[in-house]
Amino acid sequence: MSKSADKILHTAEKLFYENSFVGVGVDLIRDESGCSKTTMYTYFKNKNQLVKSVLEARDEKFRQRLLDYVAETTGREALNRLIDWHLLWFQEDNFKGCLFVRAVAESHLGDQDIISVSKEHKVWIRNLITEYLQSYSKTEMLVEVTYTLIEGLISRFLVEGYDANVAAEIKNSVNQMIDTLNPQSN
């Protein structure tokens, strides 16, 4: 991808995350990126394609950062690293929740590309949790509860602010649930 396209993507992602998809127009993205409207439309035929491309780029970065953080761990240790990574994200000064959820919330039912990219992102996270918990009994239940707790914390900490006590309780609860359902793992 060209430097101009990268600049447009980076600018659009920043503006969408800080504001909203609906509230940010292509004129603002053009002005902030320093690219012309013609250049924007050379790489992205419309705003929906730009949103989809932003989500795809964000998903790629998200996956790489998370996998780097969890690197060289497996099983429960990897799961705990995955949880820790999310807890660190929730504490960032500019934390605004999940861009994928926000994209779906602001999209129309016909925006299947945006919905599909967002769904793929969430399925990937759930599959990663499944990979880390596959050696435990009641895997499906452990995965669904863990995934739902993480997703719930995204909303909770966005609205209420980060709470270290709640974060620790959730992480401890996940580990206690694994131990309770898998006494041989203690």
Give the positions of each predicted feature:
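Alpha-helical DNA-contacting segments of helix-turn-helix folds
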Residues: 51-58, 65
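Short, well-structured alpha-helical segments
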Residues: 80, 140-147, 151, 171
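Amphipathic alpha-helical segments used for helix-helix packing
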Residues: 92-112
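Amphipathic C-terminal alpha-helical segment
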Residues: 147-166, 176-184
